[in-house]
Amino acid sequence: MLSIERKSLESLAALALFTFAFLGSEFFFDRRMGTLLPAEGVVGAQALILGASVVGFLAFAALSKLPRAQAWVPFTETAGAIACLIAVLMLDDATALQVAGCAGFFFLGCAGAEAHWNMARAFEGSPSLAKGTGSAYAAGILLQFANNQFIPTGAWEVAMLCAGAAALGALLFFTRDDANAERHGENACTSENANTTTSPSTTENVQPLNRALWSVALVAILACLFSTLDGVTTLSDAQGSIAVDEWPRLFLAASGLVAGIVFDIRERRYMGFVMFGVMLLSIISILAVEAGASPVIGLIVFFFSSGFFVTFFTTMFLQLAPRMRTPQLWAGMGRAANNVCAFTISGASLALTQAGVVAVMIASIVLFMLASTAFIGAGLFRLPPTAREREVTEAGLAAESAPSAEELQAEFIARYGLTPRETDVLRAVACDERPLKQIADDLGISLRMVQRHLTNIYEKTDTQTRTGLTKEFMGK
């Protein structure tokens, strides 16, 4: 069986490689499409590949349950993505390029969903989930930065992306084998636990569907907000107010790491509050830039908040997935919801930033109200219990469900078939340390009769002394 350290390292590496392959492939596809289409066409083409990736994220749950899926799904995911990357490099027709791109991002979406599910399994119950998520995101950003800065564009760039996808496939394949080896034990535990008494906390954790749906809505709303902030930055870049180069993307890696550390404080008790503060900061920066402040403010806040946002929605669904009935579907739902919004609202967000300060203010207030409602619905404004508080709660529930002393004594009497008179003698002897003569007087029978009943009780219960009988009867 794998140690938790190795499982965690493999899942971190897989998520980092997915981030690198996904972002790098998106950047490469946009650049290739830009040689064949005008800017408006590139935006539409990018929307289609992001939509295809969402389909891949959602399809993985069904693919993983097909017969013998453990053997061929990881291979198909990454081999298909590699083949499509090579096709994007070689094709010169826009339609063919679009088809290859959509197919490739469908496969990348499937691989990404599996990488997220592996991460959710490896870090289930871990107090370091957000730090792991932020580290994986930062590593993927750094790999993409190095690929863009130091690797020549074209064939060498594609070779690096294919190498990343191949490494991702290898990790997914071997982690699947390890997961299958442990599955029988997990199923046995699940069947055994199904017969136990259900406590209120168990009922809450089995299927938190309501919270999951609110979380999807929250990601969609926040994606609208950050898309608007991105529109402010993009518009300023296009007008020449600022120059958005490649190096500021390093702030994404740094903010992802910081977000992971901050979110994990006291087992993510304050993650919702921190993200709410980041949201407020983003709204203020949008209004400030629209009102005439330096666009650099929007740029700084955008890169700072984007790392927090990615770490937030990834951690939120990784934490939620193991408690859902179809965890493979929900582990990557944060990325899927973000991608849906990225290709559906980018044009509307950019148009909004060009509509004037009043329109932006109204939209910001509406987004704030919707986001606040979604934060509450997702339960992110309720402080979750710490490990110590959970232990105390579980101990209290166990004490409440444990049989009482009266129930234990009644079960003891029934088990050994004691008569009513023997029961009276047993209760008197076990609850009173006085000599048998005084107990006999209290019961209104002779000492000889008490001794006879006591002898019968010793024989039935296989005890030999009054002390031993008392311990058995009292359950001590």
Indicate where each model-derived feature is located:
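C-terminal transmembrane helical hairpin of 12-TM major facilitator-type secondary transporters
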Residues: 270-310
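A late C-terminal transmembrane helix in Major Facilitator Superfamily
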Residues: 324-354
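Symmetry-related core transmembrane helices of the 12-TM Major Facilitator Superfamily/SLC fold
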Residues: 156-175, 359-382
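Helix-loop boundary and gating motifs at the non-cytosolic
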Residues: 2-54, 214-240, 314
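Helix-to-loop junctions at the C-terminal end of transmembrane segments
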Residues: 55-72, 254-270, 353
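Hydrophobic core of transmembrane alpha-helices in multi-pass small-molecule transporters
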Residues: 95-114, 294-311
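Helix-turn-helix DNA-binding segment
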Residues: 398-455, 460, 471-476
